Design a protein with these regions (language model features):
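Conserved acidic donor-binding segment of nucleotide-sugar-dependent glycosyltransferases
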Residues: 98-105, 114-119
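Aromatic "clamp/platform" in nucleotide-sugar-dependent glycosyltransferases that forms part
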Residues: 61-63
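A short, well-ordered alpha-helix in the C-terminal region of glycosyltransferases
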Residues: 114, 121-135, 145
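Glycosyltransferase donor-sugar binding loop
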Residues: 10-25, 41-42
Length: 153
């Protein structure tokens, strides 16, 4: 989807995948010849902070997730997020991000284009993101809710 867009923005595909190396090899082959697309292995520390802090948009095109920690992290850094419309992602972002239909490359392309062409909307989502996620998933609140769950007969 990204290769179809005319933009000077970069796409950083960070981290590994849980499936296999074959998937990453397929992605690398699809990205061949496009110097806007960069691959990293697993990132943490200062590099992770740098990527989150400077991202225009965080994209999570998952088909299957548990509680997507990378999504929580991205939002805590105040990123505008674009996620597939699977329940695990939509339950996290509610109306504070952009969704696309799972597995629909054309819809992903359309939403990427929207984000690139509407920086004011992206800025609005960035402003909504951090406070919301840090309040909703604050450790003390999560611990209290978990404790109540275990104490319920």
């Amino acid at each position: 989807a990204f290769k179809r867009l005319k933009t000077d923005k970069k796409l950083v595909i960070a981290g590994g995948v849980s499936d296999s190396g074959d998937y990453m090899n397929t992605l690398r082959a699809l990205a061949a010849g496009d110097d806007r697309i960069l691959f990293t292995d697993f990132v943490d520390g200062a590099l992770r902070d740098e990527l989150y802090s400077n991202a225009y948009l965080f994209v999570l095109p998952s088909d299957l997730e548990g509680m997507p920690l990378s999504l929580l992290e991205a939002m805590s850094y105040g990123n505008c997020v674009l996620v597939s419309d699977i329940e695990e992602c939509t339950n996290v972002i509610h109306d504070r991000g952009i969704t696309f239909r799972q597995g629909d490359v054309n819809d992903l392309e359309a939403k990427l284009r929207y984000a690139i062409e509407h920086p004011i909307a992206v800025r609005m989502f960035k402003q909504l993101s951090s406070d919301y996620i840090c309040d909703r998933f604050q450790w003390d609140k999560v611990v209290d809710a978990t404790l109540k769950l275990y104490q319920t007969p």
